[in-house]
Amino acid sequence: MRRSLRLQGKKNFSRVYKEGSVVRSDYVVVYFLPASEQRVAVVVSKRFGNAVRRNRIRRLLLEAWQENHDHLPSGYYIILPRSSLLSVEENVWRSKVKELFHEWQWASGKNSPHCSAVL
């Protein structure tokens, strides 16, 4: 992923958590704050295993986001996997995450400044 698409900095993370909206699914939680540019961060805690496993989850979630980000509203995204993600096969949760982005895209519209859908 290009460096310019990464969400970085404690200040930006705090703003997204405090002022942003939340969309929850069975396997991920996505925080969103409308902004003029599109940036993303995937936060995977240590409870998901060693660094190799966490980085794999991070890469797969980023891949799902990259496949759909052109159709999502501009803003800051923080993607957090839920622990239920570990209890199912990879293809199941990947399809559910992609489905979440498609439903979010449909609910918000491409140029919508804010998404209020809760899935």
Curated annotation (Swiss-Prot):
Q: Report the EC code(s) recorded for this entry.
A: 3.1.26.5
Q: What start-end ranges are recorded for coiled-coil regions in this protein?
A: none
Short name of one Pfam family: Ribonuclease_P
Q: Name one GO molecular function term.
A: tRNA binding
Any one annotated GO CC term: ribonuclease P complex
Q: Which reaction does it catalyse?
A: Endonucleolytic cleavage of RNA, removing 5'-extranucleotides from tRNA precursor
What does the function comment of this entry state? RNaseP catalyzes the removal of the 5'-leader sequence from pre-tRNA to produce the mature 5'-terminus. It can also cleave other RNA substrates such as 4.5S RNA. The protein component plays an auxiliary but essential role in vivo by binding to the 5'-leader sequence and broadening the substrate specificity of the ribozyme.
| Name of the featured protein | Ribonuclease P protein component
Record organism = Coprothermobacter proteolyticus (strain ATCC 35245 / DSM 5265 / OCM 4 / BT)
Q: Which gene encodes it?
A: rnpA
